[in-house]
Each structure stands twice: as C-alpha cells, then as structure tokens.
Amino acid sequence: MKRKWWHGKVAYQIYPKSFQDTNGDGIGDLRGVIDHLDYLGIDIIWLSPIYQSPFVDQGYDISDYYKIDEIFGTMEEFDELLAEAKKRDMYIIMDLVINHCSDQHEWFQKALKDPAGKYGDYFYFRKGKDGNPPSNYRSYFGGSAWEKVEGTDYYYLHMFAKEQPDLNWNNPEVLNELYTMINWWLDKGVAGFRIDAIINIKKDLSFPDYEPDGPDGMTGIFRMVEGVDGVGELLEDLKKHTFEKYDAFTVAEVFNMKKDELEEFIGDDGHFSTMFDFSAHEMTFGDHGWYDAKKVGFDDLKKVIFHAQKECEDVGFLANIIENHDEPRGASRYLPDYLQNEDGIKLLGTISVMLRGIPFIYQGQEIGMRNCHMASIDDYNDISTKNEYAVAIDAGCTVEEAMEACYENSRDNARTPMQWDDSAQAGFTTGTPWLFVNPNYKEINVKEQLGREDSVWYYYQKLIALRKSEDYKEVFTYGKVVPMFVEKDGIFAYARKTEDQTVYIITNYSREDITVDLLTTN
C-alpha cells in the first residue's frame, strides 16, 4: 500500500452555521471557527458548505461556487482561516456539492428561460408523458423527482429538493465549469474536499420507469442509480483533471456503490482518498421512511463494523464516523438506556477512533452531545425532517408517532448549536440562535468538561494522542483490525496488529463485569 500524507491524520467536521457565532446574528461564522482552532487540536477540518446559497438545504444548494455566503463572513476571513490553520499544521477541506446546484444559480435561471437552449443542457429537462412526469422516480427527500416548468411541457430532474436541480455530467461544458471551479479552490490552498452525493452523477438517460415500491405509485430514485453503469469513468476524469494534480485529500459520500467497486473507489489509485463507512447508518433505514426505521444494537454494530473493516483491509482506508450533520447523534442512536452516560459515550468513541482508517469526529461528539426533542414539527428547520414527517402522516401514523420518528432520526439533532458553556444560548451566540439550543446544555458543555479531567472531552484527547504517539502511530495507522471474542455477548473487542506490534481494544457494553482470557486468544 502506498503511504500518503493524510495517513494517520484525525479529522473534525465543523457545521459552521452551528459552531460559533461572533457577531450576534444567531448564525455561526468563519470568525468563530478561527477563534477555536486551538481548541480542536486535530489535523484536518472539514467545513460543511459555506458557499453562497439560499439555504433551502442548509447550503447544499449552491447559487455561486466562487463566493462565501455573507452569513458566514468574507473571502478575506476564509483566507485568514487557511493561513491560521497552516500555522498549526492543520488542513482545511471543503464540502464539494457537484451533483446539483441551487435553482437560484445563474445557470439554472438561464435554463428556465430556454429549456431547449445551451443552459437547458446544463441540466436534465425532459417533456412529460401524457400530462405526467417523465418517469415515476421519488426523490431522496420525498415526492416526485421531476418538477414541472410552469407554462411549458418540460420537467427538470432533482434527486433531492426541487430547489436542487441535477447538473448534466454528460455535457463537457458543465464538466469544464466544475473542474475550473475545483482547481480555483485548490489553488487558493484548500487541501481537499468531502464530496457530496457523488455516486448520483451518472444517470440512465432513458429514465425508465420501475415497479412502484410505495402507495404513492413511485419508486425510490436510487433504483435508477443502482441500475446504471459507467460512473467510474466520470469519477476518474474528475480526479485526473483536479485532485490528482494537487495530491488533494478527498473523502466521498457514497451510498449506492456496487460491491465489486471498492478498490476502484479507494484503492491505491482509486477515485478518492477514502470514503465514509455508512454501514451502521444504513442498518437503520426503514422500508418506507423514518417512521419504520430500525433500531441498531451493539451486536449489529459489531457485525457491520468488522465486515466493513475486513472488506477494506487490503484495499484502502475508510473514514470512520459515529455521527455527522446528516444523522442523529450517535450517543442517542446506538447506546442502550443503561449506557446513556459518559462511560457509554467513551466506549463508543473508543470503538470508532481506534479502528483502522481516518477518524472523523463531528462537532459536539467530543463532549457527548445528544439528540434534541423539538415540541412541534414547526420547530424543525431541516427540509428532510419536514418531508419525512409528512410521509409518516400520509402512511397513517399519528402525530405522536410521526414526531417520535423525527426525535430519533432528524438531521437537526446534529445541527443544534454547539454547547460551549452554561450561559444563555450555551455560549453559542449573544443573539437568537437560528435553531433551538438543546436544553441539556447546562449539564453538557465544553467549559464544564475542560474543568474535569475524567470528562468525555479529555478522553477523546487521550484517544487521539495515543493514535498519534511515536510508540503506537504505526500500528494504529497501518495495523490490521483482528476481531476478538466475536461470539462473546457484551464484548466489542479487536486487536490492531502489525508484524512487530499488537494492541488490544476491549470494551464491555453489558450491564455486568466480564472476564476474558487474553492468553488463549488468537
């Protein structure tokens, strides 16, 4: 395996809108990130989108790829962030959203005026069939994936929200626009990108109908993605025109990859440096939506994590996560009631951070932030939460049942403001926060944990220091994961092993003390 500059690094995801507000407008900003660089003490910072956007989907609907949205600050402040990070040997990676853009982007506004013209071919405009959409796809956010252009026979494709039209990756002009933009950011000093929803860029241009999978008569658009070949050619072209030139670090968000494509994606010469391991998250998916989402226990977690590690051990590195901006808090999702405490959170952190791969820690994870129960669906900001609530109600759920699904699965669970201290609004802002602060901030906050050496925050610091220590960095970076005591109830254990060194990671997630025999284990 080729050794890369990013091997052995630890990453931290910042959701800027909820990280730290420094001007009192209730929205986190770049100055807040700069002010806390020394707090982090990690190597790579992934910034969720800060581009100009109408924020229908919290910045994943970009209206100008070359501008910082004014709610976050200025390009000068971004340049300052790059410079300050460099002083600390830290790397900044940005979110790259190139499957789609905002319907407010100049390209799409021009396309609406002439769907059959030049800019119409930047997107997927198709005429309807007998007064219906071109095909029966349900978008990832619910409802038809086709939106009718008022006053015409045309519809446009949007795999996500209707305000996020899909870009046409079959158009060389679109590719040139995107490659130029990516290289502009890399020239500026960005170290790489987290690449959003990238598997979706390849479409079956015949847009065939599929057998409906729900009472709405539609089928999930993932069916089309799974049925089409050739995405690898697009991804390789993307890499060669951009990332490869800069030795950039790239981490892909991939859900629909085919089983035999792992090496192609993250091998030594793969399309990307790494990709997130979503195997635990995928186990929670319901057949019809959040309202029938599945519970995942530690026995399930053990199986899928070990399976993912085994598949990857001779191929490349995974990006290991417990939570991110698109998922509920890991402590709330994975820990049983009896482990809803700091010991349980430390256990979960140990399992994840010490695995082979790149640990990605999401803001607030290092202090054990939890899900936040909102009183009403109106209190949620997330577009997918509102859509899933409607899906649950349409399926016959009561308001209470639909709200319970949101409590457990909403993306807003991870987007509540960072809890810095026990002052008003958790020290996040002096104004009114854009999203509710979790009421538990009095008990769970950074200031309290920095004053207590047995806290979750200090424990995460110790895990990171151990991974990066001179004595152990080789085994924790390149050592294989060897599952241990797999059949023993209540134990989640594995070894990190090289030819010269073995380290045991053993956790007990039961209610009882358990004895294991290390002398007889293989």
State the predicted function of each range.
Residues 513-522:
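Beta-strand-rich binding/interaction modules
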Residues 4-7, 210-215, 220-223, 233-245, ...:
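Loop/helix patches that line or flank the sugar-binding groove of alpha-linked glycan CAZymes
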Residues 2-183, 187, 200-260, 267, ...:
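Acidic/aromatic-lined carbohydrate-recognition and catalytic surfaces
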Residues 45, 193-195:
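Hydrophobic residues within beta-strands of alpha/beta enzymes
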Residues 20-34, 291, 335-340, 428-434:
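Short, polar loop/linker segments at the starts of domains and inter-domain junctions
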Residues 92, 193, 362-363, 505:
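Residue-level marker for buried hydrophobic side chains located in beta-strands
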